[in-house]
Structure formats: C-alpha cells, structure tokens
C-alpha cells in the first residue's frame, strides 16, 4: 500500500515537471517568435508583402527589376516615377501606392509620438568622446551628416573609424550593422580599418568582410552605385553608408558656368537618393565635401573657404560639420549647421588606431 502511494506521488511529480517543462518551452517559443516579429517590424518591409489585392507576383518582379526593393521605396515614390516602369499601368500604380500607404505610416502624428521615436534613434560613436559629446551621442542614423574642410583635416579618417564602430553592439556606441563605402578619390585604406578593429578588440577579417567597398569613377557611376546599395541593404543589415568624397567627381565631370545647372540637378538627384536610403533603411549617411576659396574683393575675410555644392548640398545635409587643422595631430570640429545642435566646437585627434581624444590639448599659436 505504501509502495502504491509513493508511485502515485512520483507519477504526479513527473506530470507536474512535464507540464512545467512544456510551459517553459512554450514561453521560450513565444519569446523567440515575438523577438523575430519585433526584428521584422523594425526593418524595411519586403516587396512580397504587397502581393495580393490585384498585385501579382509578376508585378512585384517588374518593380524589383526597376530598382525598387522594399514597400517603403514604393510608398515614397511619386506616381509618375512608377508609370515609367515597363508594364505598370496607371491603375496598377494607384494600386501599388494604395497598398504601400496602408503598410507605411505617412500621415500626421503627434509631436509626443515623434519625440519618442527620436529619443530611440541610434547614434554611432566617432571614436572620440569629445566629438561624441559635441554631436550629443555620435553620428545620427536616419539622416545625412556632412564633413567638410581642406585637405588633411581628418575627413577620411573619421569615415574609416566609423566604418568599424558602426559594427559594434549598440551598448558600445555602434549600430550592429555593416558598412557600405563609396570612394571617389582612391583614399580608402583597409589597413586603417584593421588598426581600429584591433583597438576595439574586433576580429580584423570579420570587420573587413562587413565593409562593402566600391570605387566610383564618374558622377553617373556614383549615382548607379546607390541603386546597387539599395539592393544590398534590402538583403542584409547595414547601419552606415559613406561617400568620400561626395563632390569630387562633380568638379571634374561638370566644368564652367555653362554646365552649372546640369551639375546641380545631378547633385540634387544624388542627394535625394541618399536621403531616401536613410529614410528607407534607417542607416546613417556620412558624406565628405571639399572646400573652395572665396574671392569676393573683401580685404578681410576671417573664413576665406566655403564648402562647395551650393544651396543644393546645404539644404540636403541634416548636419554639417566644419573641420580644420590644429596643432600636431589635433583637429577642430565645429557645428556649421544643424537643426538641433548648438554652434560649438570640439577638439579630437587622429591617432594610429583611428580617431580619438587628444592626450593633451595644445593651444594654437
């Protein structure tokens, strides 16, 4: 009789353990599913989500071949651009825009909700604490940051450092994503990435594998590379796009006042595409810009150099940073234009392991 009672108690305990184990398993499954759903909701939506309600797989293939890879890209595109796609009628374009607008929020929201979204934005560390403080956390994702200055002011060095720090975990000031690097001047050096990777304890080979590099040879090619970039970003997680330099090829491909209008129109299209990528994929876009001397007949001009690109570039960039040389390896960064950052300066240094803080600040002579 006693043995029977013991067996019944053991059996009941086993049943409870099985139920608890099953409940734990179900809980872990639910958490994993929720994490996957949250991750999917946070990223861009694939075109396949538009299929149905009169939109066929053939239509999806047509717009994909035309260079549209996400639902967001359809929602942000004017109707007349969709009509240029072969095989897309006006009725079909209306259908595409209607279905995309249901999935992508494009209406009004309260300032409170927008403030909450802004507070959740990821910033990517520059490698310098002083520079990060100036930028209130680092380079902002979802917007365009422009670096301009004369030669040897640290523009390319900041880009090289960011190409590594964007791969860091978010709690270390990174973006947990790959980098896409467009080089127009032939100044990209992978050995600099290895030095920065070693500084942060990252595997050098993995860091280089996570940087997609392309050399642009003319202004048209530079714009075409953004089309390839959109395709790559739709397939993998990128957190940074670098264009170094954004304007170098425009200065040589378009010469004289006779081509000024064509140059500015082409540059405006390029900058608009950059902003679309930032909006669509939530990446940080960093561009470098050159400067030109001002010859205006004024005998005294405290700042004789200005960034090129005119009003097109000035209005397209969200944050503009002016860089100038300091003493030794020190460089000075000034907020030139920003919708939210105060006009102030910070001193950083170019070290053997990338951009960092100066060991001691040397006052200029």
Curated annotation (Swiss-Prot):
Keyword Nucleus applies: yes
Binding site for ATP: 149-156
Gene Ontology molecular function: ATP binding; ATP hydrolysis activity; ATP-dependent activity, acting on DNA; ATP-dependent DNA damage sensor activity; DNA strand exchange activity; double-stranded DNA binding; identical protein binding; single-stranded DNA binding
Disordered: region residues: 1-25
Polar residues bias locations: 12-25
Xref: InterPro entries: AAA+_ATPase, DNA_recomb/repair_Rad51, DNA_recomb/repair_Rad51_C, DNA_recomb/repair_RecA-like, DNA_repair_Rad51/TF_NusA_a-hlx, P-loop_NTPase, RecA_ATP-bd, RecA_monomer-monomer_interface
Biological process terms in GO annotation: chromosome organization involved in meiotic cell cycle; DNA recombinase assembly; DNA recombination; DNA strand invasion; double-strand break repair involved in meiotic recombination; double-strand break repair via homologous recombination; mating type switching; meiotic strand invasion
Localization: Nucleus
Main location: nucleus
UniProt keyword list: ATP-binding, DNA damage, DNA recombination, DNA repair, DNA-binding, Magnesium, Nucleotide-binding, Nucleus
Pfam family, one: Rad51
GO cellular component, one term: site of double-strand break
Top-level taxon: Eukaryota
Keyword DNA-binding: yes
Family stated for the protein in its record: Belongs to the RecA family. RAD51 subfamily.
Quaternary structure, from the entry: Interacts with rad22, rad54, rdh54, rhp54, rti1, swi2 and swi5. Forms homooiligomers.
Stated name of the protein: DNA repair protein rhp51
Gene that encodes it: rhp51
